[in-house]
Amino acid sequence: MSSTANGTTPFYYVPHPSRHPAMAAFGLFLLILGAGQWINGEEWGKYSLFAGLIWFLVVLYQWFSDAIHESESGQFGHKIDLSYRWSMTWFIFSEVMFFGAFFTALWWARSHSLPALGSLENALLWPDFKAVWPSVVAGATASPAGIVEPFQTMGPFWLPTINTALLLTSGVTLTIAHHALQHGDRSKTIKFMWMTVILGLVFLFVQGYEYAHAWGDLNLKLSSGVYGSTFYMLTGFHGFHVFIGMLMLLFITLRLQKGHFTKERHFGFEGAAWYWHFVDVVWLGLYILVYWM
């Protein structure tokens, strides 16, 4: 977070007692309760889910507004800045572990589960099974008939390649914006930040079109065996992270337009940039392991 440099900045700012954590927890409770009930066929679950989501977002808006006000009023000194940096570092580390688990699941299914199911001792149980990846493709059934409908895989051309170019370009525009901010060129910073936000938005539209194509034209669904589940699990969670990152960059851009951040103090900008570059790296892994291999 940024802060104004003045003589009143405390060594370590201790905020006043806040109701925001408890209110946010209540919103998450409604959201998770509703999601669980909706999945299990309870009609009221969707109302609880959306009510909890709206509640949680409103609390986050108020919470972030308070934090921004404290920052811009000069309450955040070096210790607070350092704590934010370590917090963001550990948050991104947790995200590395999050995606690492999913990449490991993909590797395990391909390298261990399929060969084990295709071994000789299972030949009597599943005589038609073929240890190939993906487990079921059009014209080549590799699982017991009727369990999984045949489907086609999503190759790297052209939608995933277009999205790769979009994300890599957004990383470049974000870096240019960062350098401009470090040199005090606010106008250039804002221009390239808007370019980054737009590139992220276009990425999401392309991925939405990709999903429609995969589901409708390729018959690739969540129920399409382990290939379908890992495909949507990895690309879906990554798309969600792109959406969150895009919102972060949008809020940072709006704050820049309001005059927030200086070339000396702008960790709010840097934290969002770290997150966006992390999203870029994860996509490169997806592009190679999911679409190419």
Label every PLM stretch briefly.
Residues M1-M293:
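...captures the hydrophobic TM-helix bundle architecture rather than a specific catalytic motif
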